[in-house]
Amino acid sequence: MSVARNELDRYHFGTLLQLETETKARLRPFLLKYGLPLDEEGGSAEAVAGFVAAYEEHPWHEFLGGLKPLVDSFVERFAEIAQAGPAEDQDVLQSMVVHEQAFVSWIDREMAGEGGSLDAAIVQLKFPLPVPETP
């Protein structure tokens, strides 16, 4: 991510983008099963642009604090969908709850100054990014 202020931010954003990419690939069979479109919605580019603008305009903790309500709403929404979904789809539906909870964990741990903020995301990746060397 070219707007990253430093290598650590670049790693964080890269890891979260990797989680998004792998999740989209994992969901495609589920989407096909229900006749849902496989192409990405045009709104995702606009959402990314909004996140980039917020990152550029705010210090790290303010940026994270601004994301928190949105991510919390995603967790709630996917939990409701999982609760309403059929038993045969629970693995996929629950995986989306876990996916969103990884973002909550990242935000909460970063805001608390704790290490391992990306652990919940990394454990879901088949192709994790290499951790940058610290000086």
Predicted regions span which residues?
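Non-heme di-metal
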Residues: 1-135
